[in-house]
UniProtKB/Swiss-Prot annotation:
Keywords: Cytoplasm, GTP-binding, Ligase, Magnesium, Metal-binding, Nucleotide-binding, Purine biosynthesis
EC supergroup of this enzyme: ligase
Pathway membership, UniProt: Purine metabolism; AMP biosynthesis via de novo pathway; AMP from IMP: step 1/2
Presence of the UniProt keyword Nucleotide-binding in the record: yes
Binding-site residues, substrate: 300-306
Family the entry assigns: Belongs to the adenylosuccinate synthetase family.
Amino-acid positions noted as binding IMP in the UniProt annotation, renumbered to this chain: 14-17, 39-42, 130, 144, 225, 240, 304
Primary site of residence: cytoplasm
Active site: 14, 42
Record's protein name: Adenylosuccinate synthetase
Gene3D superfamilies xrefs: Adenylosuccinate Synthetase, subunit A, domain 1, Adenylosuccinate Synthetase, subunit A, domain 2, Adenylosuccinate Synthetase, subunit A, domain 3
Keyword match GTP-binding: yes
Amino acid sequence: MGKNVVVLGTQWGDEGKGKVVDLLTERAKYVVRYQGGHNAGHTLVINGEKTVLHLIPSGILRENVISIIGNGVVLAPDALMKEMTELEARGVPVRERLLLSEACPLILPYHVALDNAREKARGAKAIGTTGRGIGPAYEDKVARRGLRVSDLFNKETFAIKLKEIVEYHNFQLVHYYKEAAVDYQKVLDDVLAIADILTAMVVDVSELLDNARKQGELIMFEGAQGTLLDIDHGTYPYVTSSNTTAGGVATGSGLGPRYVDYVLGIVKAYSTRVGAGPFPTELNDETGEFLRKQGNEYGATTGRSRRTGWLDIVAVRRAVQINSLSGFCMTKLDVLDGLKEVKLCVGYRMPDGREVDTTPLAAEGWEGIEPIYETMPGWSETTFGVKEHSKLPQAALNYIQRVEELTGVPIDIISTGPDRDETMILRDPFDA
């Protein structure tokens, strides 16, 4: 039997999943996206050349890998075509390597218009979405009115369904939000112009994955965002609109849940967050700015500067529980180089003085929380590009070991730079 490995984020996204997926796909036959949309921003650096993917799985640059967009992903046709065109201009034969589920919900211009209208209306209480229509598209899916890739096979029926839903959403846009209506004919023309390209890539993903598993193929599932942005388990309402956790693999791809063999949690050596929402270890000082600059913490999708802070072990332990993590990959260890001391958040002090070591479930429960820190010596030596575990500074090794002790999960991979080969694989997930 084959082995199925899940790669997902353990924090608020931006942990470095894309690089790790790209690295590990050297052995994989399939790479599957199972949730989210083009709100993801997965950055790959190969031989110094940077590639940012938003919708297409990170395995697309490997000629031996088939990339799959599963049913749990909301798919923006225009965004997919843009990404395909850019990759094809660089010589990547995307259409030979990419497959789609016919059950993918479509993100269309009225979703984007609604997303931005709602954020504008929220004012100071805005969630901080990427403004790309992700939430409204999932909303249509759950309400059973959304259009899917499968609808593109019958263009006449698609046109009728589209007209109904455009009228439905335009009423809200114009009369409630006082925004401009979406042009039905333009949306229809734009989608139909590329419909045949999309339908040509459609397969029965569940059937394909089950057959691949039986044939002993190695399959990797690529998560987007992070555990603490999960619609059910994250810092609600400051979350995304999909299940970013390991449970989303089965529902978002059609793989049977018993067939997940290893779950790799990507954990950044410190914490970051984009947009609004709780962030107990946030640093609004020189150290926070140091982390932002050294880590180049600016969103691959939005360009927004990320909030930065110390590694929150309490939050990461929640990710361990929810995802039943098999191991960690620690990324951006090199960003901590040069700090005299480093801190780990090992508990929270509540407003009433109680000390706890678990995360609240709703955003309101995080208000007034103070982090309880464990302080460790930093290191002056560089870890950037180090490829042997034994050559890391002792203080860095101590930091890694302490994270393992506090979480109960081994760190199987360590990333010391953005390039594919600036990585130490201590235990390969496909062999674990």
